[in-house]
Amino acid sequence: DCSSGWTAYGKHCYKVFDEPKTWEDAEKFCSEQANGGHLVSFRSSKEADFVVTLTAQTKESEIVWMGLSKIWNQCDWGWTNGAKLNYEAWAEAESYCVWFSSTNKEWKSRPCSLFGHFVCKSPAW
């Protein structure tokens, strides 16, 4: 079973939120909405199809965050000559997070600090 306003699929509940947030704020929001809640993750193409259909009902061709990211400081950087990176002068560290369009299930990345709509997923009870 799912809480009111959430939609069941398999053993999980899903809800689309129209209020744009940064990726980090959206993930925090999802964790506050339901026990075990997170930004949506996909375990199969069928699940992705279900979520795209769910988002298309409320949003048209919008950016929708999912729970996948590449945190900038977790990247392994290295020089092409194999030397260790012991000097850095980055202008600004930027993390990239993954989104999909409400019209298809193709994944794209963009800076996590930008705003997007989002889908929360939590275990059904």
UniProtKB/Swiss-Prot annotation:
Expressed by the venom gland. It is found in: Secreted. Gene3D superfamilies: Mannose-Binding Protein A, subunit A. Pfam families: Lectin_C. The keyword Magnesium does not apply. Belongs to the snaclec family. Heterodimer of subunits A and B; disulfide-linked. This is Snaclec coagulation factor IX/factor X-binding protein subunit B. It comes from Echis carinatus (Saw-scaled viper). The lineage of its organism: Eukaryota, Metazoa, Chordata, Craniata, Vertebrata.
